[in-house]
A protein has these predicted regions:
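Domain-scale recognition of functional cores that engage charged ligands
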Residues: 1-354, 358-374, 380, 391
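Alpha-helical transmembrane segments and their helix-helix packing motifs
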Residues: 1-28, 41-43, 53-109, 117-124, ...
Length: 725
C-alpha cells in the first residue's frame, strides 16, 4: 500500500497464495463476512486484537445462543427490547445471492465444510440450515468445463456461490495445497474464469496475520485520512528492526504470538515466563524475527459465570461480525462472547474449554427501519429454485436408516431375552435358557462356538447357525453384551455409526430429531454393583423408545422426497434382513416351538396381532403368516418388499434412471414365493411344518435383499466410499 507495508510481510506469509492473485471479484469486494476479535480493557475501552477473514466462524453459535436464552428468559428479552440477530442472517443470504456471476436470477449457493470431524461442524450445519443452502464437502463438488457443479441424484447442477468454511489454501489441490482432500480440484480455475464466486475470496486468509495490526493505523490514515474508529491492540512486528528492538526490550509487558500460518496455538505471556523460558523465546525470535509479533498485554474484562462453586469471575472476549456486498454493511447485533474455562486462565480459547454467552444489544428508536432493510431478501421464497439431493447425503441417509433399524432390532432381542430371564424360575427354566441361547446365538448377538450335537446338513441343505457356548450362563453373557461389549455390532458401535451418518446430513435433520439423536450416546461405565437384569432392561427400553421417537419424527416430519425414500429404503432393507435372520435362527432351534415362537412374536411386536387373528397358542403356520406373508404388518417381510418396490418405482420415475427390470422382477418373484410356499412336510410329524422349506426361503430372500442393497449403492452412491455392512 504505497510503501506502507514491507514486502516481507506479504511474500514471506504462507497465506499469500500466488495462484489467487488477480482473480475476478464480484463488486470488487473480497471480504463478504468479517469477524473482529475484541477485548475490553479494565478502563472500559474496546480494542481489536485479531481479524478473522478466512471464514469468521462463530456467528452460528451466537444465533443458537440467542435461541436457547430466548426459551429460558423470554420475558426478560422482550422487556429489555433486545435486538434480534435474525435480520443479519437474512441480509447475509441476500448478499450471497447478489454475488452470483452474471446476475443469475436463481443462483445455487452452497456452504463448503471440511466435514463432520471439524471442530466447528455444528455451526456449519446450523448456518447452512438457517440460510437454506446445501451443506457440502469437497467430494460433493466437481469442476466441469470451468464450472463448479454439485453432484446430485438428478445429475450435475452448476454452483454459483460457495460460502467456504475451508481455509483457502486447502480449497483446491490442483493449484494450492496438493495434499488437501478437503477442497475441489479446479476451483481456482473456475473462479478465474468468473463462473463461481467464493466467499470470502480465496487468498483473504493473508489478512489474519496479526502483523498487519502494526501497520493498520498508518494505512487507515493514508487511505481514509482518519484514525481507526476502533483501535487495535498496540502491536509490533519483529520483522522490522524497530519492532524487534521494542519486543526484546519490553518482553515482560507483551504477549508474543506467531506472525504467520496456523501456529496460533502457542502464545507466550511475557510476565509469566521464567528466566530460562525468556532466554529460549528470545533465541527463537532472533533466529526468525519475521515469524513473531508482540502485542500489548491487555487483560480482558471479566463477566460472572455460574459454576458448581457459585458465581466466579471469568475473562471475556467478544467476536463481532459484519456482512457486506460493498454497499450496505450489516453488523450482527451482539456477537459471540467467549468466557475463559477457569478463573485463573489469562486468555480465552474455545479449544481449551472456554464457554460462550449470549450478547445483548438493546433496541433504540431508529433500529426498526435498519432491520427491515436488512431483512428484505433479494427474492421471494417462492422464486428460489430447489436444489437436488447430493449423492453423499443420500448415501448417509440410507445408512442412517440401516444402522438405526439394526440397533433397534438388537435392542428388541435383548429386551425380550432380559424379560424372559427376569421371570420367575421354574423347572422349565433350563429349557427356556437353552432355546433363548440358541436363538440369540443364531442371530449373532453372543460369542459362539459350533454346537457339536448338531449333525452336519445333507447335501444341498443349509447348515445350522452357530450356537452360544455355555448356554446355562446366558444371564451373564447377555449382561456382558449390554454393559461391556463394544466391538462391531455392539450398542456403542451402532450408536457411533448412527451419529456419524446423522452428522453428515445434520443440515437436513430437524432440531427435534437431533434432540432425540443426542440421547443415543453410550452410558459410560456402569459400576458392577448396579449391573442387573432390571437395570439393563431399563437401559434397553429407554433406547428403544428413543429410536421409536426418531422413526416417528422421520415418518411425520420429513417431506416425501428422495432423502426420505433413501432413509426408509435403508430401514426396510435392514428390517428385512433382521426378519430373515430371526426366522432362520428360530427354525434351527430344537424342541417344542410354542414358547420360542411367542418370543419371536414379542421381538417383532406382533404378539397382539397373532392373538387377535388366531385365538390360539403360537404355531409355525400362523407365525409365518403374520411375520412373513402379511403385507399389512409393518414388521412382516412381505411388507418390507412391498415398501421397497414402491420406493424404487418412485425413484425411477423421479430420476428417469434407477433399478433394472431384473430387480423389479426379483422383488415380484420373492413376493410370489412368499405367498405360494407350501410348508407342509412330506412326512407328517407333530409340528406339521417343514422348517427346511422356511430356511431355504429365508436364504433366498436374504440373498435378494443383499443384491438389491448393492445395486442401490452402485447406482446412486457410486462416488462415495464403500461402507462396511
Amino acid at each position: 500500500v504505497d510503501g506502507f507495508l514491507p514486502p516481507e510481510l506479504i511474500y514471506s506469509n504462507p497465506g499469500f497464495l500466488r495462484p489467487c492473485r488477480g482473480l475476478p471479484v464480484a463488486g470488487q469486494v473480497l471480504l463478504h463476512l468479517y469477524g473482529a476479535d475484541l477485548v475490553r480493557s479494565g478502563g472500559g475501552q474496546w480494542r481489536c486484537f485479531a481479524d478473522r477473514t478466512q471464514s469468521a466462524s462463530g456467528a452460528g453459535y451466537a444465533h443458537e445462543n440467542r435461541k436457547v436464552v430466548s426459551r429460558v428468559l423470554p420475558d426478560e428479552i422482550r422487556e429489555a427490547s433486545v435486538r434480534s440477530p435474525s435480520p443479519f442472517f437474512r441480509a447475509l443470504r441476500s448478499i450471497l445471492e447478489s454475488l452470483a456471476p452474471q446476475g443469475r436470477e436463481h443462483p445455487l449457493m452452497v456452504l463448503l465444510t471440511p466435514g463432520p470431524l471439524h471442530a466447528t461442524y455444528f455451526e456449519h450445519a446450523y448456518l447452512a440450515r438457517h440460510l437454506g443452502i446445501p451443506l457440502v464437502e469437497g467430494a460433493d463438488l466437481t469442476v466441469r468445463d470451468l464450472r463448479v457443479c454439485l453432484k446430485t441424484l438428478e445429475g450435475l447442477q452448476p454452483v454459483d456461490v460457495v460460502l467456504r468454511r475451508v481455509d483457502d489454501s486447502f480449497c483446491d489441490p490442483l493449484e494450492l495445497r496438493a495434499e488437501s482432500v478437503l477442497g475441489v480440484p479446479g476451483l481456482v480455475q473456475a473462479a478465474r474464469a468468473g463462473h463461481v464466486t467464493v466467499a470470502n475470496a480465496l487468498g483473504s486468509g493473508l489478512l489474519e496475520s496479526p502483523a498487519f495490526l502494526a501497520f493498520l493505523p498508518a494505512v487507515c490514515r493514508h487511505l481514509l485520512d482518519e484514525d481507526l474508529k476502533l483501535p487495535s491492540v498496540p502491536t509490533w512486528w519483529c520483522g522490522e528492526a524497530e519492532g524487534l528492538r521494542y519486543v526484546t526490550a519490553h518482553l515482560e509487558r507483551l504477549v508474543v504470538k506467531p506472525a504467520f500460518g496456523r501456529r496460533r496455538g502457542r502464545i507466550w505471556f511475557g510476565h509469566q515466563l521464567s528466566a530460562a523460558d525468556k532466554t529460549r523465546l528470545l533465541e527463537l525470535i532472533a533466529a526468525r524475527p519475521q515469524e513473531f509479533v508482540g502485542q500489548e498485554c491487555v487483560m480482558p474484562s471479566s463477566a460472572p459465570v455460574w459454576t458448581s462453586a457459585g458465581f466466579e469471575r471469568r475473562s471475556v472476549l467478544l467476536r463481532a461480525y459484519v456482512a457486506t456486498n460493498g454497499t450496505n454493511p450489516v453488523v450482527l447485533p451482539g456477537g459471540l462472547a467467549r468466557v475463559a474455562a477457569s478463573e485463573d486462565d489469562p486468555w480465552v480459547s474455545m479449544q481449551g474449554g472456554a464457554g460462550s454467552k449470549d450478547t445483548w444489544v438493546l433496541r433504540s428508536g431508529d433500529d426498526d427501519g435498519e432491520e427491515s432493510l436488512a431483512a428484505a431478501p433479494a427474492q421471494g421464497p417462492t422464486d428460489r429454485r430447489l436444489t437436488g439431493l447430493p449423492s453423499r447425503a443420500a448415501d448417509s441417509l440410507f445408512w442412517l436408516g440401516r444402522y438405526a433399524e439394526r440397533l433397534e432390532q438388537h435392542l428388541r432381542v435383548l429386551r425380550c431375552v432380559l424379560g424372559q430371564l427376569a421371570s420367575d424360575s421354574s423347572p422349565e427354566t433350563s429349557d427356556r435358557d437353552d432355546r433363548l441361547g440358541h436363538l440369540v446365538a443364531g442371530i449373532g448377538l453372543l460369542p459362539v462356538t459350533p454346537e457339536p450335537s448338531v449333525a452336519p446338513p445333507a447335501d444341498g441343505e443349509p447348515g445350522p447357525p452357530e450356537t452360544a457356548d455355555d448356554v446355562p450362563d446366558l444371564t451373564r453373557k447377555v449382561l456382558d453384551w449390554v454393559y461391556r461389549f463394544d466391538g462391531p455390532g455392539s450398542i456403542p458401535d451402532l450408536m457411533g455409526r448412527i451419529r456419524q451418518n446423522a452428522a453428515a446430513v445434520r443440515d437436513r435433520l430437524s432440531g427435534d430429531t437431533w434432540q432425540v439423536l443426542d440421547r443415543l450416546v453410550p452410558q459410560g461405565e456402569v459400576p458392577q454393583a448396579r449391573r442387573s437384569i432390571a437395570h439393563a432392561l431399563g437401559l434397553v427400553q429407554g433406547l428403544i423408545l428413543n429410536l421409536a421417537a426418531f422413526n416417528g419424527l422421520a415418518m411425520e416430519n420429513m417431506t416425501r422426497g428422495p432423502g426420505w425414500r433413501f432413509l426408509d429404503c435403508g430401514r426396510r432393507l435392514e428390517r428385512g434382513f433382521s426378519m430373515t435372520s430371526l426366522m432362520t435362527a428360530a427354525a434351527f432351534v430344537p424342541g417344542a416351538p410354542t414358547p420360542l415362537l411367542e418370543v419371536i412374536l414379542d421381538i417383532a411386536d406382533s404378539g397382539m396381532t397373532h392373538r387377535q387373528r388366531y385365538f390360539a397358542s403360537a404355531r409355525w403356520p400362523g407365525v409365518v403368516e403374520v411375520l412373513v406373508r402379511d403385507v399389512s404388518n409393518p414388521r412382516a417381510l412381505a411388507f418390507q418388499l412391498s415398501a421397497l418396490r414402491n420406493h424404487l418405482e418412485a425413484l425411477q420415475d423421479e430420476f428417469r434412471v434407477g433399478v433394472d427390470d431384473r430387480w423389479s422382477a426379483l422383488i415380484e418373484g420373492i413376493q410370489g414365493r412368499l405367498l405360494s410356499a407350501e410348508f407342509a412336510p412330506e412326512v407328517p410329524d407333530r409340528e406339521g411344518f417343514d422348517r427346511q422349506t422356511l430356511i431355504a426361503l429365508m436364504e433366498t430372500c436374504a440373498q435378494g435383499l443383499a443384491g438389491l442393497s448393492d445395486d442401490l449403492t452402485h447406482r446412486y452412491f457410486s462416488h462415495t466410499h464403500p461402507r462396511v455392512s
